[in-house]
Amino acid sequence: MALRFPRFSQGLAQDPTTRRIWFGIATAHDFESHDDITEERLYQNIFASHFGQLAIIFLWTSGNLFHVAWQGNFETWVQDPLHVRPIAHAIWDPHFGQPAVEAFTRGGALGPVNIAYSGVYQWWYTIGLRTNEDLYTGALFLLFLSALSLIGGWLHLQPKWKPRVSWFKNAESRLNHHLSGLFGVSSLAWTGHLVHVAIPASRGENVRWNNFLNVLPHPQGLGPLFTGQWSLYAQNPDSSSHLFGTSQGSGTAILTLLGGFHPQTQSLWLTDMAHHHLAIAILFLIAGHMYRTNFGIGHSIKDLLEAHIPPGGRLGRGHKGLYDTINNSIHFQLGLALASLGVITSLVAQHMYSLPAYAFIAQDFTTQAALYTHHQYIAGFIMTGAFAHGAIFFIRDYNPEQNEDNVLARMLDHKEAIISHLSWASLFLGFHTLGLYVHNDVMLAFGTPEKQILIEPIFAQWIQSAHGKTSYGFDVLLSSTSGPAFNAGRSIWLPGWLNAINESSNSLFLTIGPGDFLVHHAIALGLHTTTLILVKGALDARGSKLMPDKKDFGYSFPCDGPGRGGTCDISAWDAFYLAVFWMLNTIGWVTFYWHWKHITLWQGNVSQFNESSTYLMGWLRDYLWLNSSQLINGYNPFGMNSLSVWAWMFLFGHLVWATGFMFLISWRGYWQELIETLAWAHERTPLANLIRWKDKPVALSIVQARLVGLAHFSVGYIFTYAAFLIASTSGKFG
């Protein structure tokens, strides 16, 4: 018999129905379940696929650089970053005739183009790129790295170059190399780039391959480093009148601790960032020499964990057994990595707008909104994935004997307490927050807005004041002008911080009130409920009182047949599936809040947010409805404008989103009947019946249909909001 897809599963390859195709796609990356898989081959396959992933990333970033260099307006933008709109790439074939051509010919281009809302122009400008030639050079270099990655992936699948399992499980060596090499050396290299290329470029000096060996980044060269006079590198920083990209008002410092923002670019001082990366580099270079490898010095992680037994005995055997549990479970390691990456990605969303690192990006409002929203959604998907792989760990890799009475086993032992506490917190937050919102709605409906319940977030305001925000009048810590910390801050550390935190032109520590208090608790409800579903899914993955043998059914099962009632919807996969809806819901509230607060801030009418955000109708009417007006006017009987593409994306997003419900609400029988009717008609229709199939068409399984429904729901949801966000922001601010 000829080899049929999927080759990795003979059982599936012999399936006579279309299930073969869908199950084949679904399990293609579940290497553990493939025929003839060994632990060694599993690790080697994953390792090789990392090279493929890197190749794709390098190719993609190379494409960004290449298209901007070829079709963009980078060199024009550099001359006037605040007034020229950055072009992402050309539009080859604008449909809908001459009005479309005119609507999309922008940014000084000769033909229709797309505007870039990704912030790459600001990023490239900040790190010292100035010409299209620079961009082409970068694109070629990344293309080379991409090819190198592909060769590396191929090489590591050859017998001679395949790493052994022992190499993959050498945790100390991997940690040392990742800490020192990945974080330490790359941070040091980045400091080098900032000091040698980016900072000179910000002062009007062009450093390239032809002159970088004879341009001193600092007038005194390496002298201060070797004589211990490091503070000389911080003397004479750029002045507050410095014009970015020119020598006017520039200084000579390379490593500073100024704090706050460059007055013209509204971004962090480049010299502060170089200093930051140098500090990070030193920390990680030291951290990467802490663990015991071939040399017999340093820490053994296993010894560290075995020693972690709390003296009071309240955590049982502490971390005993954890080293082998984690080191032998790829899912546990992936769960930890995803949890960390998810948190970092959300922090990136937060810090990219509150502490902008790139010159002039803070004044590009649409880009700010797009980047915040993008990173929060990505973070949501990554974090839910962490719990999914945590659950798979419990089902496939967890060994109760190895973990007796340690912290992991104790999590399982008192899971009822954990789950019920999370449930209580979610219920409390939900009912109280909704109660306040609805009460306020009713008061407005009755024409008595003064009877709203408006709660000032005094604790959060106190924390903001402690960091130096004076407008609340708390007079505490850094906002107390007579305190020693305040006076020291003026001269020793971050003198620019206190100015920045009290300026209204940035997004540092925004002024908050009752509307913020309410939406904060709505978001807290979403976070706690998402966490509840995910934690319950992982802790109940091995079994529950209702279904003690759950782990024998695997990660995703629909039910245990008709004879065992109540076993539907309780697989670990179902928990993940439900949690994603809550995650999307929560990030919806987060991005609505961020966007509305910033729109009113940028337009100078913060009172609109403050007054309308305290009741639900305010959100629906003054945020969603009011800001969709430009969007739904992307085209009308008189033609179209440059927002039309977002109007269509908005409609298309709704369509995809609604299609999701078709898969989520109906089950297999309906589709099976429909499929058989369609197949009957197909076989009896002339011409059509020339096309035959070998596999008998069958409906998707319950779990697959849910996945397809969830995918459409998620993609449609995000498409719809992305179009709304970009159109409403760019429509207002150009």
Curated annotation (Swiss-Prot):
Gene that encodes it: psaB
Record-level GO BP terms: photosynthesis
Functional summary from the UniProt entry: PsaA and PsaB bind P700, the primary electron donor of photosystem I (PSI), as well as the electron acceptors A0, A1 and FX. PSI is a plastocyanin-ferredoxin oxidoreductase, converting photonic excitation into a charge separation, which transfers an electron from the donor P700 chlorophyll pair to the spectroscopically characterized acceptors A0, A1, FX, FA and FB in turn. Oxidized P700 is reduced on the lumenal side of the thylakoid membrane by plastocyanin.
Electron transport found in the keyword field: yes
Disulfide feature: none
Cofactor note: P700 is a chlorophyll a/chlorophyll a' dimer, A0 is one or more chlorophyll a, A1 is one or both phylloquinones and FX is a shared 4Fe-4S iron-sulfur center.
Protein name as it appears in the record: Photosystem I P700 chlorophyll a apoprotein A2
GO molecular function: 4 iron, 4 sulfur cluster binding; chlorophyll binding; electron transfer activity; magnesium ion binding; oxidoreductase activity
Residues given in the record as chlorophyll a B1 binding sites: H654
Chain ranges passing through the membrane: 46-69, 135-158, 175-199, 273-291, 330-353, 369-395, 417-439, 517-535, 575-596, 643-665, 707-727
Keywords carried by this UniProt record: 4Fe-4S, Chlorophyll, Chloroplast, Chromophore, Electron transport, Iron, Iron-sulfur, Magnesium, Membrane, Metal-binding, Oxidoreductase, Photosynthesis, Photosystem I, Plastid, Thylakoid, Transmembrane, Transmembrane helix, Transport
Binding residue positions for chlorophyll a B3: M662, Y670
Compartments, record wording: Plastid, Chloroplast thylakoid membrane
Top-rank taxon: Eukaryota
PANTHER family: OUTER MEMBRANE PROTEIN, OMPA-RELATED, PHOTOSYSTEM I P700 CHLOROPHYLL A APOPROTEIN A1-RELATED
List of residues binding [4Fe-4S] cluster: C559, C568
Subunit record text: The PsaA/B heterodimer binds the P700 chlorophyll special pair and subsequent electron acceptors. PSI consists of a core antenna complex that captures photons, and an electron transfer chain that converts photonic excitation into a charge separation. The eukaryotic PSI reaction center is composed of at least 11 subunits.
Catalytic activity: reduced [plastocyanin] + hnu + oxidized [2Fe-2S]-[ferredoxin] = oxidized [plastocyanin] + reduced [2Fe-2S]-[ferredoxin]
